[in-house]
Regions:
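CheY-like receiver
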Residues: 2, 6, 29, 57-60, ...
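Conserved post-Walker A coupling segment in P-loop NTPases
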Residues: 16, 29-95, 106-122
């Protein structure tokens, strides 16, 4: 019988994770190892295996746990509005922008943002995302002012 560390058992109970497969236990262990770091994390795996739980584990066991946690399904946001959703926009940036709006990167400042289905983002948005990953900087739609954000990105 495989012996499971008590902290892994506690995480399974807390997050409703069922199963004792070695790969699952190893994935939880890795999530616990990266949680205290400030590294961005890419989670890979088959569709439907519960990858969305791991960003929550990483956030809850990080120094950012008191900050905002935002999960974004990138595949569910229309291409025409994705930049506004992620980066925010200024009043008058486009038809219907009657006021300025914070995007998820500004809202999650000090916390964690989980970008599910990140590969579904348009290439132009992926280029803007790269800037956030590299320097923590972004520009709202309709603005020329560079803003800083201090977030952990999990995708």
């Amino acid at each position: 019988m495989v012996r499971i560390r008590p902290e892994i058992q506690q995480i399974k109970l807390r997050f409703g994770i069922v199963g004792n497969a070695e790969g699952l236990n190893r994935a939880i262990d890795i999530a616990m190892q990266v949680a205290p770091t400030d590294l961005s994390v890419l989670i890979t795996g088959e569709s439907g295996v519960g990858k969305e739980t791991f960003p929550q584990i990483i956030h809850q066991f990080s120094r950012r746990k008191h900050g905002q946690y935002i999960a974004v399904n990138c595949g569910a946001i229309p291409e025409g509005t994705i930049d506004s959703e992620l980066f925010g926009h200024e009043k008058g940036a486009f038809t219907g922008a009657i006021s300025s709006r914070k995007g998820y990167f500004e809202e999650a400042d000090g916390g964690t943002i989980f970008l599910d289905e990140v590969a579904e983002l348009p290439m132009t948005t992926q280029a803007r995302l790269l800037r956030v990953l590299e320097s923590g900087e972004f520009i709202k739609v309709g603005s020329s002012t560079v803003q800083k954000t201090n977030i952990r990105i999990v995708a």
